Each structure stands twice: as structure tokens, then as C-alpha cells.
From Swiss-Prot:
Catalyzes the phosphorylation of the position 2 hydroxy group of 4-diphosphocytidyl-2C-methyl-D-erythritol. It catalyses: 4-CDP-2-C-methyl-D-erythritol + ATP = 4-CDP-2-C-methyl-D-erythritol 2-phosphate + ADP + H(+). The active site is at 9, 134. Keywords: ATP-binding, Isoprene biosynthesis, Kinase, Nucleotide-binding, Transferase. The lineage of its organism: Bacteria, Pseudomonadati, Thermodesulfobacteriota, Syntrophia, Syntrophales. It comes from Syntrophus aciditrophicus (strain SB). This is 4-diphosphocytidyl-2-C-methyl-D-erythritol kinase.
């Protein structure tokens, strides 16, 4: 058996540069993994691919990206074996934290190791890109700028390690719906975009930006209230991650983050997590 942790991510900066003719959008986004994890277990089996998601009403077939990831890498490798996968969720669903993409990436990584398939990291990233635009990022070491539809990665050097308080308000948001409502016309020309610096806590606070907030916060005004609350309890800045609805605040040390987590977690209506940057 092989056990592996599957981390969440936050978007420290997200600009939607243009809508493409294929209806996808070109992005520039800075992604950072954080220490909130789902747990995955893999057990070799002779009964094909079996997926279990105890405690959650999640599909346990090809509708689940974990199942598809397992099927794809075993098919690519020609390996005739099967595997039983157990997924224990801690990352909120449809929350802008990349839980599904992370689960798929860790499935590729785990099965490559478990069955000694000998795919390189680059090859795993190519397989991952066929499953979802964010999947390659979770196979990439450290924070990264992602371009295109999010699948072209460049290492983000010298991004400071910080603490985060994540607040998930308990409802789900459809990424597809948010992009459909984004007021961005079809743009054919290439957009030239200047990347902000993220070399210090001050840089990070100044660089926090998410174009998708213009849609999600209009649909759910309570998210702005959460951002304001985080700042009032010591966050240097606050932002919605991805298409939402999770909002995070950045803190310079663990003590300040823990204090905010304690206070903001008391009402019990939100899921509140104190986490740190990881590579």
C-alpha cells in the first residue's frame, strides 16, 4: 500500500488576459501550494480500478478525475494491473483550491511509483494536462506562474513563505459559470502583461489580484465581508482563490494567523483553516 498527501493551492494573482476562439481563456496566474491536504491510499489489485470516497457523496467511477487519472496512466503504460484507491477529502469541494486537480496529480505520481512505470516528471505533466489545466502545477516543485489556459508553467523564484487563513463559506461555485459571466470580449491580439514582483510580504500584499472577483463577489457579496474581516484581524491582504468561493488572508507569522483562525472559526458557519506555504 502507498499513502500520499494531496495539497490545496491558492492563486496569489490571477489575470484573465483574453477570451480565445476556442472559448477558453488565456491567464496569467501565480499559484502557491498550501498545507491543507486530502489523503489518498493506493493498493494493488487484480480487480481493475476501484475508487472509494468514504464520507462523501462523490462519484466513484469515470466521473471522478481520480479514476480517470488512474485509468489514463495505466493505459499509457500498458500495465495490466488494477488498483484500489481510497480518497479522504479535507479540501472543500468546488472551492477554488484545486482539490480535484491535486488528487489527479498525486494519483499519477503514486501509480508511477507504486508500479515502477518510470515516467519522467515531464511525461507525468503531459498526461496531467490532458486531465485538467491545473493538474501539471501539482507535479511542479514550488510556486509557479501559469500561462495559457493555466497549463504552461514557469518557476516563481523568491516568493516568500507566509501563513494563510482560508475561509470557505460552505457553498460551491461553478468555475464554468464564473467564466461565462466574465465581461470579456473575444480578443485575438496577444496581450502584453507585466508580471508583478512577489519578493516580500509587502510585494505580496500589493500584488494580490483576481479578475474573477468581479463576478463571484457580485453573486456572493458575503465574500467581500469575509475579506474585510480577515484584514481587520491582522491579514496583510485578502483575496478570493481561483473562481471562489474560498477567501484567504496572508499573515507574516503563525501566531497572528492562529489568532485570526481562532476568532473567525468560532461562529461555526464557515470552514476555517490555518495553513502555510509549501513547495
Amino acid at each position: 500500500m502507498l499513502k500520499i498527501l494531496s495539497p490545496a493551492k491558492v492563486n496569489l494573482h490571477l489575470r484573465v488576459l483574453r477570451k480565445r476562439e476556442d472559448n477558453y481563456h488565456d491567464l496569467a496566474t501565480l499559484m502557491q501550494k498550501v498545507s491543507l491536504y486530502d489523503e489518498l491510499e493506493f493498493q494493488p489489485s487484480n480487480r481493475g480500478i476501484q475508487l472509494r470516497c468514504p464520507g462523501f457523496f462523490l462519484p466513484e467511477n469515470e466521473e471522478n478525475i481520480v479514476f480517470r487519472a488512474a485509468k489514463k496512466i495505466l493505459s499509457f503504460s500498458g500495465c495490466p494491473t488494477g488498483v484500489t484507491i481510497t480518497l479522504r477529502k479535507n479540501i472543500p469541494l468546488a472551492a477554488g483550491l484545486g482539490g480535484g486537480s491535486s488528487n489527479a496529480a498525486m494519483t499519477l505520481l503514486a501509480l508511477n511509483k507504486l508500479f515502477r512505470l518510470n515516467f519522467s516528471t515531464g511525461e507525468l505533466m503531459k498526461i496531467g494536462a490532458t486531465l485538467g489545466a491545473d493538474v501539471p502545477f501539482f507535479l511542479f516543485h514550488g510556486p509557479a506562474w501559469a500561462y495559457g489556459i493555466g497549463d504552461r508553467l514557469k518557476a516563481a523564484l523568491d516568493v516568500p513563505k507566509v501563513w494563510f487563513v482560508l475561509i470557505n463559506p460552505g457553498f460551491e461555485v461553478s468555475t464554468r459559470v464564473i467564466y461565462e459571466k466574465l465581461n470579456l470580449g473575444l480578443t485575438k491580439e496577444i496581450i502584453h502583461y507585466s508580471i508583478p514582483r512577489f519578493l516580500s510580504m509587502e510585494d505580496m500584499a500589493a500584488g494580490l489580484h483576481n479578475d474573477l472577483e468581479s463576478v463571484t463577489l457580485k453573486m456572493h457579496p458575503s465574500l467581500q465581508e469575509i475579506k474585510d474581516l480577515l484584514c481587520s484581524y491582522g491579514a496583510a491582504g485578502a483575496l478570493m482563490s481561483g473562481s471562489g468561493p474560498t477567501v484567504f488572508g496572508i499573515f507574516e507569522n503563525e501566531d497572528k494567523a492562529k489568532e485570526a483562525e481562532t476568532v473567525l472559526g468560532k461562529p461555526g458557519t464557515w470552514a476555517v483553516f490555518c495553513v502555510r506555504s509549501i513547495d
